[in-house]
């Protein structure tokens, strides 16, 4: 057989970039380079008129029962914490079944994924494929949040609340088994993975045990309910007994103790610290110190991401609304102002870039924008590239691969590890739920091309349904067939505790969604478990100036004047 040489640009136009090719992410300065291509050159598969995936060519006679894939995403550029590679991705029974080379093994060499008559194709040529995002800080204020999050590329959400109650406006806590049952029953209506956090503020175990058995997959300690050392100690003790995670929003006013007292109450036990910078709440001015502890899994909420010229101005009004404060009361105003510090917000940028802050989340409608978790993660990465240059791991490589792996881990695999669901979601890996998002590189992180949930397309931009083709304007993000009927419950799960499942929660509530027990959330995970984000510097905060130092180095940076992934993408 004769080989034919073609230009890289021509090859990329036909099959997408290959090993050594570089791709810019949206309009950022972040450049990725393809590390490996799983294809066999000359044997690539592609769907369409006159293309490869036809009967007797790239499509075999193998049935699905015999091993053919249900769906193949062809020639996609996978961007994940473990690598940046070009491959075909197979989906079977709603799970990722293989990453490799698709085709017809009867006539093609190197085939690891079989295409048969029962195989559908999603064209990934020239596209980027990522795992669906996981937002682990949700105030369940309104159900419309879920669609907005899904359309941004988030396929899993964890948080608390009961709807637009004042307790939910301020805290991510679902109080008590009755409210928990109603929330979990409502989850059958949504095509995403969902989990409920119960209220963790109690000084005795019984109320917390009741909530865990009632369906909580985590417990949330929030200062508005009283995050005292006694409540912290009790909550962590119960969590250890039932293998669920604890999230904490610490005591901004330092009423029941200072950050040192809270750390002492941890007793070295694993805990997920929300908005660790402090603008979202927590010991003023030095809660950020916990980001350097080995047992703390720290995350940010996105209003402070990244630090810009507008960040400080917008926060005060947000805070007054979210925490039911009155600007005419001096004490309420002082409470709000104590949380907004430009010095710690600037340091937050750098701690993310150093891998000391491990996760990104939203704090939806309660000082956070749930549709912008992914955008603001990459805006932070871009700002740090512009201000700090290449990371040491990327020096001399003419790409930003390590930085990209570090940042994508913040909203995919790391929250999945922290909350005990990384065996099911969080990355593009064989054996995991096929929760996948396809992006055009120019719109990466901003507007997805297609969102796959449990192997089924659940959302995509769609043109006029009455048009002769799918693309005429107006183009809107719309729910697809996977978001309706029993398909939405078959392709997603509810995260809960093993105790709830053992106690027959699904039967008691009459729900259709499968329950998935969180696991390995306690002593066997620590900051070292946070992939690419496990740094534990010694962090100090000057109580007078609020300056932040990590291992003695001052952490400061200028606010951004202009951001990528912003107005040019949302003009209409």
Curated annotation (Swiss-Prot):
Ni(2+) 1 binds at residues 137, 139, 220, 363. It is found in: Cytoplasm. The modification N6-carboxylysine is found at residue 220. Pathway: Nitrogen metabolism; urea degradation; CO(2) and NH(3) from urea (urease route): step 1/1. CDD domains: Urease_alpha. Residues 132-572 form the Urease domain. Substrate binds at residue 222. Keywords: Cytoplasm, Hydrolase, Metal-binding, Nickel. The active site is at 323 (proton donor). GO terms for cellular component: cytoplasm. This is Urease subunit alpha. It comes from Bradyrhizobium diazoefficiens (strain JCM 10833 / BCRC 13528 / IAM 13628 / NBRC 14792 / USDA 110).
């Amino acid at each position: 057989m004769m080989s034919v040489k073609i230009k890289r640009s021509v090859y990329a136009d036909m099959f997408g970039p290959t090993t050594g090719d570089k791709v810019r992410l949206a309009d950022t300065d972040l450049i990725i380079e393809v590390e490996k291509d799983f294809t066999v050159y000359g044997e690539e598969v592609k769907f369409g008129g006159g293309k490869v995936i036809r009967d007797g060519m790239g499509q075999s006679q193998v049935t699905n029962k015999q091993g053919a894939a249900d769906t193949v995403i062809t020639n996609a550029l996978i961007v994940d914490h473990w690598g940046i590679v070009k491959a075909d991705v197979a989906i079977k029974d709603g799970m990722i079944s293989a990453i490799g080379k698709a085709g017809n093994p009867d006539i093609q060499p190197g085939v690891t994924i079989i295409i048969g008559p029962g195989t559908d194709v999603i064209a990934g040529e020239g596209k980027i494929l990522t795992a669906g995002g996981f937002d682990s800080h949700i105030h369940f204020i309104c159900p419309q949040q879920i669609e907005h999050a899904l359309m941004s590329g988030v396929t899993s959400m964890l948080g608390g609340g009961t709807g637009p109650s004042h307790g939910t406006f301020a805290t991510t806590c679902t109080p008590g088994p009755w409210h928990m049952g109603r929330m979990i029953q409502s989850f059958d209506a949504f095509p995403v993975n969902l989990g409920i956090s119960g209220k963790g503020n109690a000084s005795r175990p019984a109320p917390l045990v009741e909530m865990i058995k009632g369906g909580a997959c985590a417990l949330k300690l929030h200062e508005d309910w009283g995050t005292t050392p006694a409540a912290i100690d009790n909550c962590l003790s119960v969590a250890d007994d039932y293998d669920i995670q604890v999230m904490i929003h610490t005591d901004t006013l330092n009423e029941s103790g200072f950050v040192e007292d809270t750390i002492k109450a941890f007793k070295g036990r694993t805990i997920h610290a929300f908005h660790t910078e402090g603008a979202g709440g927590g010991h003023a001015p030095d809660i950020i110190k916990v980001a350097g502890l080995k047992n703390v899994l720290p995350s940010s909420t996105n209003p402070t991401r990244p630090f810009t010229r507008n960040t400080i101005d917008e926060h005060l009004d947000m805070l007054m609304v979210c925490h039911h404060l009155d600007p005419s009361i001096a004490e309420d105003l002082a409470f709000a102002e104590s949380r907004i510090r430009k010095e710690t917000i600037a340091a937050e940028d750098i701690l993310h870039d150093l891998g000391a802050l491990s996760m990104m989340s939203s704090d939806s409608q309660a000082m956070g924008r749930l549709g912008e978790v992914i955008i603001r993660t990459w805006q932070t990465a871009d700002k740090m590239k512009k201000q700090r240059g290449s990371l040491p791991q990327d020096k001399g490589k003419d790409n930003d691969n390590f930085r990209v792996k570090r940042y994508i881990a913040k909203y995919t695999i790391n929250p999945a590890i922290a909350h005990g669901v990384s065996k099911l979601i969080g990355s593009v890996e064989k054996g995991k739920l096929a929760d996948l998002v396809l992006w055009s590189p120019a719109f990466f992180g901003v507007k997805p091309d297609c969102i796959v949930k449990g192997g089924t397309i659940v959302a995509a931009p769609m043109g006029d349904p009455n048009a002769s083709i799918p693309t005429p304007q107006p183009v809107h993000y719309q729910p697809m067939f996977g978001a309706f009927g029993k398909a939405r419950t078959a392709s997603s799960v509810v995260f809960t505790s093993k105790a709830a499942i053992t106690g027959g929660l699904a039967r008691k509530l009459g729900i259709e969604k499968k329950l998935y027990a969180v696991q390995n959330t306690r002593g066997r995970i620590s900051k070292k478990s946070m992939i690419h984000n496990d740094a534990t510097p010694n962090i100090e905060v000057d109580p007078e100036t609020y300056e932040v130092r990590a291992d003695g180095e001052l952490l400061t940076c200028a606010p951004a004047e202009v951001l990528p992934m912003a107005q040019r993408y949302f003009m209409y």
